[in-house]
Amino acid sequence: KIEDTVINIKRNHNSYNKNWKIYLASKQYINQDFIVVCSALNTEKLLEPLGHKISLEPILGQVVELKLKNKNSNWNKWPAILNYQSINFIHHRSSHLIMGATIESGVEPSLLDKQAMLLMNNTSPEWLTKSKIIHEWNGVRARPKDEPAPLLKELEKGLLINTGHYRNGILLAPYCAEWIGMKINDQ
């Protein structure tokens, strides 16, 4: 576990057969056989000096927690996550619903995009339009340009990337971890 900012990665040709040297903000370095780059938007900056072009763009997700006017006792018939028009819905307690989407380019939240999400692009049912926002938050993620997400690649011996989880990252995490483990065990 590295509890410091990685500022540079270089190939290591001199140190006990370790393939890579990781330079840290604290002016220290670590020699490693494998590096798994999971740095989202910083991935490009770390890999470009090594000659690898990875194109990622920022994409913003917005989430709201809604208090529904009426309690819903039918949550057991609701799937764990419901997706409609790229909007995710998760039931949360008997009268709460979490609603979110990761569809906005850039890093600044848009009130218009949030309103479109809340209105489900003008298809929102009445029970949803009558709900009250009790909490909201947003976050920036990395989306691959011109490639499917997530990016799972072995760029060189011992240099793996696992990034670009701009949607469904939590669902893909077990598979991504398995892929990384297989790549490391195969070498």
Where are these regions (language model features)?
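Hydrophobic/aromatic beta-strand patches that form the interior of the parallel beta-sheet core
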Residues: I2, V36, L160-N162
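A conserved short coil-to-beta-strand element within the FAD-binding core of flavoproteins
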Residues: I2-K21
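General beta-strand recognition
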Residues: K21-Y23, I98, L160-I161
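Core beta-strand elements of the Rossmann-like FAD/NAD(P) dinucleotide-binding domain
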Residues: A25-F34
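Active-site substrate-recognition segment that forms the wall
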Residues: F34, S39-K157
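Glycine-rich phosphate/pyrophosphate-binding beta-alpha loops
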Residues: L159-L172
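Internal hydrophobic alpha-helix adjacent to the cofactor/substrate pocket in enzyme cavities
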Residues: A173-Q187
